[in-house]
Amino acid sequence: MNTFGDNFRVTTWGESHGKALGAVIDGCPSNLPISEEDIQNELNRRRPGYSIFSTPRKEEDKLEILSGIFEGKTTGTPISGLVFNKGQKSKDYSKIKNTPRPGHADLNYFLKYGNYDYRGGGRSSGRTTIGNVIGGAVAKKLIEFTHNIKIIGYSTKIGKINGDFDYYKNPEFFESNSNIEKLFEKIENNPLRCPSKNSDEMKDYVLDAMDKQDSVGGIIEIIIKGIPQGVGNPVFNKLEGKLGSAFIGINAVKGFEIGRGFESSELYGSEMNDSYYMNKDSIKGKTNNTGGIIGGISTGSPVVLRVSIKPTPSISKIQESVNLISNENEKIEIGGRHDPIIVPRVIPVLESMAAITVADLMISSGYIDPCRI
């Protein structure tokens, strides 16, 4: 329920307004060089206050490592890390504790469990992805250290506005690690984490939604470069199946596609098929329309993934709901501090889950020694 992975396992815990949140990572081999700073850097990318489009909730998200790392290297024992909540304002939710918020998991949690933490959504809050990022930071370090695998994410669409940058517009760009490093810098210096030339138009779109007390969603593209051929399995533990499960498990994700995705339904087979050719002593694909995965197994080409993110459900507009005590219809006005768009902050979470998935399957596929590096 709260654990992802079979060999490289990440268990997350904590609630939005609880004392702390964190993760336990089990199955990471020993001797992996890693520091608190490596993990903190990833947490900083997810932290509130990233940009003008982020929630004004003030949180340091300062990491504390409790176990599993000694003298700058993993020990092979469970790695435990936590972050203390410091900026929660639970009184913001006291007026609506009996009125489930539309678009949130409040009502479903109440109907299923009877008792739920209404403060900021409790366990269903996006803040709980702190644990995902802690685990993902370790996984990123593991797959990059052992196989130089790079994972990068960016927004390609904000609301109804399409960007002009994505993998299929220039796949050759992603052949260079230097290009990827430059792209990362560009993304991190953009408030929407969007490398497109028309990102200013996207910013105006979000600002307009904010003026209307509304919110905006978008589409994120994730590229996994350097993953070797043979990662994944043919039937139930398919690489794309595991990635889909990892991504759909993240709050706000409502759609997932690989490679050409839904566009492939419009193509002829002759357009979709990736022809092969000999490149010295190896077989390569002339194109990568399948997104780096065929038959549940990585092809060696970059894995190309896209995810649809819904608009942030917490908006300032008055909405319709019900009172769980009186069983009567009721208007609800949500206070508190919320993101007008969650897309930029979801990107490091998606990268983290991609890294955890790849690390897990690379161990089971024999590419990483489960005991020590």
UniProtKB/Swiss-Prot annotation:
User: Do you know which PROSITE patterns this protein is assigned to?
Assistant: CHORISMATE_SYNTHASE_1, CHORISMATE_SYNTHASE_2
Q: In which pathway does it act?
A: Metabolic intermediate biosynthesis; chorismate biosynthesis; chorismate from D-erythrose 4-phosphate and phosphoenolpyruvate: step 7/7
| Residues annotated as binding NADP(+) | 46
The cofactors required by this protein are: FMNH2
Residues binding FMN are 123-125, 251-252, 295, 310-314, 337
User: What do the Gene Ontology cellular component annotations say?
Assistant: cytosol
One biological process GO term for this chain? chorismate biosynthetic process
GO molecular function (one): FMN binding
Q: What is its EC number?
A: 4.2.3.5
**Key words of the record:** Amino-acid biosynthesis, Aromatic amino acid biosynthesis, FAD, Flavoprotein, FMN, Lyase, NADP
Q: Which reaction does it catalyse?
A: 5-O-(1-carboxyvinyl)-3-phosphoshikimate = chorismate + phosphate
The job of this chain, per UniProt, is described as: This reaction introduces a second double bond into the aromatic ring system.
Q: What is this protein called?
A: Chorismate synthase
